[in-house]
C-alpha cells in the first residue's frame, strides 16, 4: 500500500447523503476475482445520467470526493473502497461515515477525512463556485486546504499511522515476521500445520 502524507487534487461535490455501499458499487460488478478494475462500477446507477457530477468536466478528473453524511453505510463491501480508488479518488471528505466502510478505507489506503457538516457545505460551495478547485489534504497536520481556507479533520490515530506508514494488513504481519517464525519454530511438531507445497 502506498503511504499517504499529502494529496492535492480536484474536489468533487457529491451532494448526496445516506450513500450505501450498493450505491457506490452495485452487486452486479462484484464478480471479479482481482482487487482492481472496479472503476466502471463506481456509482454505475447514477452515472447513466449525463448530468451526474462525475460525467462533468473537470469533476471527471477529481481525486477528492466531498460527500454528505452517512457515506458508505450498509453492508461490508471492500469493493466500494476499491472502486473509489480505481477511479482515482485518494480522499473522501464527509461529516459521517459508515463504520465498516471507514475501516475498509483505512486498510486499503483511502483517506476518510471526517469534518463538521458545516465544513462539507462550505467545501461544496467553494468547489461549485470554482470548478476545478484543487484541494490539498495533509494527513500529518490533519487539515484540508481549499483556496485560502484551512479546515481541520478527524481521523483516529491508529488509522492515521497505518496510512502514513503505508501499512496494509499484510505489511503489518510482515513487520512481525521474526516473531512469527520464532513462534513457529518452537511449536510442537505434533500440532497441525499449514505448510506451503513444494
Curated annotation (Swiss-Prot):
GO biological process: L-leucine biosynthetic process
Reactions catalysed, as given in the entry: (2R,3S)-3-isopropylmalate = (2S)-2-isopropylmalate
Top enzyme category: lyase
SUPFAM superfamilies reported for this sequence: LeuD/IlvD-like
Gene3D superfamilies on file: Aconitase, domain 4 (3.20.19.10)
Pathway(s) the chain acts in: Amino-acid biosynthesis; L-leucine biosynthesis; L-leucine from 3-methyl-2-oxobutanoate: step 2/4
Keywords: Amino-acid biosynthesis, Branched-chain amino acid biosynthesis, Leucine biosynthesis, Lyase
Protein name according to UniProt: 3-isopropylmalate dehydratase small subunit
Disulphides: none
HAMAP family documented for this protein: LeuD_type1
E.C. number: 4.2.1.33
Species lineage: Bacteria, Bacillati, Actinomycetota, Actinomycetes, Mycobacteriales
Signal peptide range: none
Record-level GO cellular component terms: 3-isopropylmalate dehydratase complex
Amino acid at each position: 500500500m502506498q503511504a499517504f502524507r499529502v494529496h492535492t487534487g480536484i474536489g468533487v461535490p457529491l451532494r448526496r447523503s445516506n450513500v450505501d455501499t450498493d450505491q457506490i458499487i452495485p452487486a452486479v460488478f462484484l464478480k471479479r476475482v482481482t482487487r482492481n478494475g472496479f472503476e466502471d462500477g463506481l456509482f454505475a446507477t447514477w452515472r447513466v445520467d449525463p448530468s451526474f457530477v462525475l460525467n462533468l468536466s473537470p469533476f471527471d478528473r477529481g481525486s477528492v470526493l466531498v460527500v454528505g453524511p452517512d457515506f458508505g453505510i450498509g453492508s461490508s463491501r471492500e469493493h466500494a473502497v476499491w472502486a473509489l480508488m480505481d477511479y482515482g479518488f485518494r480522499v473522501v471528505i464527509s461529516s459521517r461515515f459508515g463504520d465498516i466502510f471507514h475501516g475498509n478505507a483505512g486498510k486499503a489506503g483511502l483517506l476518510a477525512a471526517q469534518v463538521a457538516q458545516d465544513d462539507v457545505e462550505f467545501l461544496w460551495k467553494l468547489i461549485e463556485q470554482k470548478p476545478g478547485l484543487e484541494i490539498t489534504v495533509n494527513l500529518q497536520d490533519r487539515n484540508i486546504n481549499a483556496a485560502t481556507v484551512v479546515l481541520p479533520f478527524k481521523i483516529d490515530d491508529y488509522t492515521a499511522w497505518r496510512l502514513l506508514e503505508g501499512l496494509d494488513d499484510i505489511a503489518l504481519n510482515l513487520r512481525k515476521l521474526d516473531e512469527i517464525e520464532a513462534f513457529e519454530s518452537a511449536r510442537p511438531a505434533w500440532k497441525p500445520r499449514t505448510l506451503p507445497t513444494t
